[in-house]
């Protein structure tokens, strides 16, 4: 709050004490394997929506294929939710049953 005295031309400002900002919690976006969604579609989604390189996208796709589930990326809640909705819409448009979920990142 600024205070000004009658014959004084200087202004004194008071600043609120700085609050430490907490980092928002992060969530893992998980891809789940199925027997119908093509490997090419999964790689394309990883590249286009999750901005993975070709190499990383293929590695993640293979991990999901052989292990049943894999992490596409780690994001804040809103970003994770948006990415899931984007992929689900693309999967539906392409008649793919690709399933995604998210869970809090531990640590």
UniProtKB/Swiss-Prot annotation:
Q: Which InterPro entries match?
A: ClpS, ClpS_core, Ribosomal_bL12_C/ClpS-like
Superkingdom is Bacteria
- Annotated stretches, region: Disordered: 1-20
Q: What does this protein do?
A: Involved in the modulation of the specificity of the ClpAP-mediated ATP-dependent protein degradation.
Question: What assembly does the database describe for this protein?
Answer: Binds to the N-terminal domain of the chaperone ClpA.
HAMAP family registered for this protein in UniProt? ClpS
Give the protein's recorded name. Answer: ATP-dependent Clp protease adapter protein ClpS
Origin organism is Myxococcus xanthus (strain DK1622)
In the UniProt record, the gene name given for this protein reads clpS
């Amino acid at each position: 709050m600024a205070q000004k005295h009658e014959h004084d031309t200087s202004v004194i400002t008071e600043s609120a004490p700085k609050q430490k900002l907490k980092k928002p919690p992060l969530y893992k976006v998980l891809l789940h394997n199925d027997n119908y969604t093509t490997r090419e579609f999964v790689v394309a989604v990883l590249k286009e929506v999750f901005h993975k390189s070709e190499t990383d996208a293929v590695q993640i796709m293979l991990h999901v294929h052989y292990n049943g589930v894999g992490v596409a990326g780690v994001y804040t809640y809103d970003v994770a939710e948006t990415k899931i909705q984007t992929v689900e819409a693309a999967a539906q448009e392409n008649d793919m049953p690709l399933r995604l979920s998210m869970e809090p990142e531990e640590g």
